[in-house]
Amino acid sequence: LKLSHGAGRLVLGAGAAPGQLLSGTFAGGVRQRAQRTGDRLDAHIEARPFVVPPFVSGWQGLEWNISLNREVPLTLRLETGASQSELDLRDLKVTDLKVSTGASKTDLTLPANAGMTTVKVEVGAASLDMVVPQGVAARIRAEQGIAAVEIDTARFPFSNGIYESGDYSSAQNK
């Protein structure tokens, strides 16, 4: 599933009904594409191109509130621009996550029970707060540009360029 969101607010979490991949509200409109191959569905939801006249005051941008199916294993690609994003993946089965964001504020909670989750985050002039739920191990490689990086070294000790949970190799969820 790929979500391409522009300027505005994106709220993402679990809660779509059984039989639905997702449900939600999409102020500003969307374009959607989906292709099914066997038991795999590739879906892309993106903001509709638009121009906001300079005289429109109070325009807040796109407002998307999306609930995903908590039972479906997901590869999730998120592209955001100048936005505020609240991404609560705690109850989702996201196995592969890529987040690309520009001038934004992003709060991201990783999955708690998805097994192995691979995460790649690319940020521009952004604020990112990422939470690894208790009971989830992590191996973190942080390449920082102008962004400040703070990692709980008591939980994820640093060694050989990597922050890693002591139980990473044996953890069920990581």
Label each PLM-derived region with a short phrase.
Residues 1, 68-76, 111-119:
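Extended, structured, electrostatic nucleic-acid-contact surfaces
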Residues 1-15, 77-78:
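N-terminal segments that cap or nucleate solenoid repeat domains
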Residues 2, 65-67, 88, 109, ...:
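Generic structural detector for well-ordered beta-strands
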Residues 7, 19, 71-73, 94, ...:
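A generic structural motif
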Residues 7, 80-82, 103, 125, ...:
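Low-complexity, intrinsically disordered tandem-repeat tracts enriched in small residues
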Residues 12-17, 21-60, 97-98, 106-174:
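Short, surface-exposed interaction patches in beta-rich subdomains
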Residues 46-66, 75-79, 86-88:
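A cross-kingdom signal targeting lumenal/periplasmic-facing segments of multi-pass membrane
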Residues 77-106, 113:
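Right-handed parallel beta-helix
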